[in-house]
Amino acid sequence: MRVKTGVVRRRRHKKVLKLARGFYSGRRKHFRKAKEQLERSMYYAFRDRKQKKRKFRSLWVVRINAACRMHETSYSRFMHALKVANIELDRKVLADMAMNDMQAFKSVLESVKEHL
């Protein structure tokens, strides 16, 4: 018995074209180009979700280092002193303190000063 793909194909095409909304030109309107672009965009999304974590961590390190250098110390010495002093603040919190609450960051720096 012959099976035709009319309904299945239409649903599959609609699903791909719906996900391709916002793409430019034929990449939005033509199924084959939309499918190719969608595969590429899904690859980029997967890859960049991993890279996002790395980029934010490096941004936090840069911000903490800048705040440390304002108080005559380096990032590596500061982080080592935190570990020795058994203060468990992560880089995200420290970077936020360095940007928005310099007094709190300075108090943390003073509390680890003896371990520098």
UniProtKB/Swiss-Prot annotation:
Gene Ontology biological-process entries: ribosomal large subunit assembly; translation
InterPro entries: Ribosomal_bL20, RIBOSOMAL_L20_CS, Ribosomal_protein_bL20_C
A cellular-component GO term for this protein: ribonucleoprotein complex
The keyword Ribosomal protein is assigned to this record: yes
GO molecular function, one term: rRNA binding
CDD domains named in the record: Ribosomal_L20
Keywords in alphabetical order: Ribonucleoprotein, Ribosomal protein, RNA-binding, rRNA-binding
Keyword Metal-binding in record: no
UniProt record similarity statement: Belongs to the bacterial ribosomal protein bL20 family.
Role played: Binds directly to 23S ribosomal RNA and is necessary for the in vitro assembly process of the 50S ribosomal subunit. It is not involved in the protein synthesizing functions of that subunit.
Name recorded for this polypeptide: Large ribosomal subunit protein bL20
Originating species: Helicobacter pylori (strain P12)
